Design a protein with these regions (language model features):
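Nucleotide/phosphate-binding catalytic cleft detector across ATP-hydrolyzing
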Residues: 1-9, 17-98
Length: 98
């Protein structure tokens, strides 16, 4: 069974869902995690995501990556909401996340 994960980076929290896809195309959630980091509060008046906010996000993503490795996840999908879409340095953030 293939195992995949979704990471949702929101303005207030980062969520992880790990699931397995069964042969009949159904899926089962294996693990869920959530960290509240209030990423939106690290956006400056000019919509720049401050370095300390980025550092906190990267720490959470490293933890989530290690959880995914323990579950033998073959693919991780990352989506981001308002705080990331609005930030003028989102390309830098995306490169660091990769």
């Amino acid at each position: 069974m293939e195992r995949r994960a979704i990471i949702d980076i929101g303005s207030n929290s980062v969520r992880l869902i790990i699931y397995k896809i069964n042969r009949d195309s159904t899926f089962k959630v294996l693990n869920e995690a959530k960290r509240t980091i209030r990423l939106g509060s690290y956006l400056t008046e000019n919509d720049y995501l401050a370095d300390n906010g980025l550092d906190i996000l990267l720490k959470v993503l490293r933890v989530f990556k290690s959880i995914c490795e323990r579950y033998d996840v073959i693919e991780i999908y990352v989506v981001a909401t308002e705080a990331i879409r609005r930030s003028i340095n989102k390309n830098d953030l995306c490169n660091k996340v990769k």
